[in-house]
């Protein structure tokens, strides 16, 4: 009998009532290439955060072409899943689908802030997405997630989007309030399959 290996299901695979409710946040990044994970980990450590990561080849942390990693902030809590989809390569279709969906969702806004957000979306070369389990995440987890988002916003010329809220300026101000749009539409869960593409 074959050994059963742990598999991370895609958010849309299970439709059972006990399915965990997930929340997503993203950074639409206009920088050409995503930074290696080592830079993110160094940034988190510089902010007095201690990221818990799975055992992996140290060389993988130097690779810019990563797709997924689990980042723990507490041994008692589920880790934050971090995904990166790009405008080229394996998950190009996922990236383009995300960009089109969010561009269309904010097309109902006609202010200058929404125009800036649309420009970031259309020029994005990659999207860094975090996924958290709503009932499990703590205040510490939200803070940890905030540092992850800040890293990509500052280092990759990005704009932050949080589901159920909207788009944020670099100063942390809500500039496009999408709460009503989120309530009337389906939340997007655009993460790639993690059973085949995780770093661990």
Predicted regions and their residues:
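Acidic (Asp/Glu-rich) sequence patches and key acidic residues
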Residues: 1-200
């Amino acid at each position: 009998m074959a050994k059963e290996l742990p598999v991370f299901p895609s958010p849309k695979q299970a439709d059972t009532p006990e399915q965990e409710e997930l929340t997503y946040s993203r950074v639409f990044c206009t920088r050409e290439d995503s930074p290696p994970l080592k830079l993110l980990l160094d940034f988190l450590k510089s902010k007095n955060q201690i990221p818990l990561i799975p055992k992996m080849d140290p060389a993988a942390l130097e690779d810019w072409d990563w797709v997924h990693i689990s980042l723990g902030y507490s041994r008692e809590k589920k880790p934050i899943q971090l995904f990166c989809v790009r405008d080229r390569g394996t998950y190009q279709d996922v990236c383009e689908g995300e960009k089109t969906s969010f561009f269309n969702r904010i097309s109902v806004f006609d202010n200058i802030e929404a125009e800036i957000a649309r420009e970031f979306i259309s020029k994005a070369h990659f999207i860094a997405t975090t996924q958290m389990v709503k009932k499990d995440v703590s205040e510490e987890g939200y803070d940890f997630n905030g540092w992850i988002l800040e890293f990509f916003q500052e280092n990759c010329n990005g704009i932050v989007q949080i589901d159920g809220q909207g788009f944020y300026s670099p100063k942390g101000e809500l500039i496009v309030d999408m709460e009503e749009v989120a309530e009337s539409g389906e939340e997007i869960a655009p993460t790639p399959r993690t059973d085949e593409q995780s770093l661990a």
